[in-house]
Amino acid sequence: VYDSSVYLMQRDRDTDDIYISYSTPKTPSRTFVYNLKTKEKKLVKEQLIPSGHNSNEYIVERLECEGHDGRIIPITITRKKTTKLDGNSNLLLYGYGSYGNSMWPSFSSIRLSLINRDIIWATAHIRGGMERGMKWWKEGKLLNKKNTFQDYISCAKFLIDKKYTSKKKIIGMGGSAGGLLMGAVVNEKPDLFLGMIMAVPFVDSLTTNLDHSLPLTIGEFDEFGNAKENKDHFKYIYSYAPYNNIKKMDYPNILI
């Protein structure tokens, strides 16, 4: 897992020029033209931040924590240099961990608004993504899906132990399959978080998986399994599906 994102945007076959986009969590997107023959590069476009932005005021860190089964999970941290690491800072922990989608480090003006208010932004590169290759994905899908949830919990506990934040000062955030992650985690560790942000969350995952008439269900079999035709898949999905595992207990604040 790297601390920047670089994309080849375009190559004109009639010239030696290629266009490259570059950004980091603290550096707005920049587009360069690079000449393959002369090895020269030129900045041709830069993302404008109307309120102003100085990348030197921020820190991007790559941390690693040990998961429940010994696997090492990367975490990307973006924060202001002046934010204190004494356990009193608010922290937003973002997670997804499905379909082999990797959460690459890139710039976001939306995140910047929070970071400028001394909120630490953390991204957990948990299994189910492919930040560490195909095996990283396979270890977070089908009958290994709970690794995704446990990895996220391990990241939250690690950040608390290292004084980046503390219990009741940490917010979880994820959307769609990341909303499934938030739902499963909050059912297991409700006392660990101040709140959860679930964007279009996939929380009634068992009912959805059982209904093959829905347009997206069959396409989900490779990721989550086929609960209708496989008893092991049914039992496993039932054991973590957020809607089926709601308990009579105090939950943190939840925004859907």
Where are these regions (language model features)?
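Conserved blade-ending motifs and adjacent loop-strand segments that build the rim/top face
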Residues: 1-8, 48-54
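Conserved beta-propeller blade repeats
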Residues: 2-21, 61, 108-112, 246
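Short flexible coil/turn linkers enriched for glycine and charged/polar residues
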Residues: 14, 25-26, 69-72, 179
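Structural motif
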Residues: 26-33
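Cap/lid segment of the alpha/beta-hydrolase catalytic domain
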Residues: 37-38, 45-171, 175-176, 210-211
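Active-site-proximal cap/loop segments of hydrolase catalytic domains
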Residues: 126-256
